[in-house]
Amino acid sequence: MFSHVVIFWTKPENANAAADLIAGAEKYLRPVPVIRSFHVGRMVSSPRAVVDQSYQVALNLTFDSKQAEEEYQVHPLHLDFVEKVFKSNCARAVIYDFE
């Protein structure tokens, strides 16, 4: 299994950016056939100091292999998400990939 986690910081000037990122991920990314599991959501506040609360949205995708994740990266729906959703709503992103 290969995991691809993306942490998004939204553009502060766009009050709807978090909702737009979540809706866009549902529309463009969930249907990509090589994705094994899909989960997107808002940051959950926590009283624990060790929990990062600086971001607004997280995306967690799993794939059967690194090769499947590489196919996802060039899939037309992923490219649409980047152009139509990510660029207009996201100020910063950090990605964690692991096996």
Model-inferred region functions:
Residues 76, 80-81:
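Short, compact, well-ordered microdomains
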Residues 1-56, 60, 64-74, 97-99:
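Short S/T/G/P-rich N-terminal loop/turn motif that feeds into the first structured element of a domain
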Residues 25, 82-83:
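Short, non-transmembrane amphipathic alpha-helical segments
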